[in-house]
Amino acid sequence: MKIRLNYRLVILLVFLALLAFREVALELRPSFLRPGLHLCAYVDNTADGTVTAIDLVKLAPVATISVGADPTGIRANPARKEIWGLSSAGGYAWVLDVTTNRIVARIPVGAAPYALDFSPDGSRAYVAASGANTVVAIDCASRRVVAHGRAGRRPWIARVTPDGKLLLVSNRDDATVSLLDPVTLAPRGVIPVAPDPEQIAILPDSSKAFLTSGTTDQISVVDLTRRVLLANLALGGTPDDLILKPDGGELYIPSAGTHGLVVVDTQTDEVGDFLLLGSSPSDAALTADAQVLFVSDFAGGHIVPVAIGVRQVAKPISVGQGPQTCELTPGGDMLLVVDTQSDDLGVIRANEPTPSLVTLVPTGSHPRDLAIKLF
């Protein structure tokens, strides 16, 4: 009788363990993810020229794909089951089919490309070649270059306005932004901005653009209707990222130089609130309802949640070493953080009153950028 009771106890414990495991798995599975749908993250690894594909339900790597030397600029095509990226050393764009985790195209784009953007409908990709001072437009269906254009010296990124009517290119060595026709890449104007312009944020109504300076404490405000520079705003430290509120009303700018977050009113073009966050805030991700901004602190090794509406800083969340790029999954269930120095992807349960780290998923060597795809 005693042996039978022990067996029953073992069976009961195993059953409870399996039940608990199932509950945890269900808890981590996003509510919108129906059977047959997949949710994956793709992380480019700069030191080994690969991309790590990570299943966000299993929270485990499922493939390592060779893409070429110095991968950068990884983006999810909004209209196709594809991840696009660049080989800066190879001078080409690569296309990854997410259903097979195989590279299906390599498209020459010019020397030293760093960033890639899509048209609003996902039909075209735009790449600026920093080493050739050129811009190309790629038809995403045929995967062929369909237009060439000239940029200024050492262009960084080509960004399309939300209305699809202009292509903006930041030219670092010229301290200008080029305006091009997004179909033909014919020139439409050149506007002077602050030194070494890099990142670009554009208001939802396509009326203004904001550009970071890579070497000063300024951001430039450009009127896209009149095509003139409105102002160069001093922030107190070099801007590291541009996060635009969905309604376009505010711009959030992490700055390692100020150890904090600068808020800019995009209607008045004035620097507003400042929040002290940590050692070296760099990148950020904003929830869809614009209530919480998650800011990565590279030197501190954590993520700082900010209740942005009330300007309240919450307790930091420890992740891996050198957290930088961060992005929320569709639905906002998880925040993914690329840990550049510990070679992993931090997964944070973001939709709780107190967000917490779930796990660290291994990546390749020296990960940099991140893309998320639901398919």
Report the location of each language-model feature:
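Predominantly soluble domains enriched in secretory-pathway, periplasmic, or organellar proteins
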Residues: 2-375
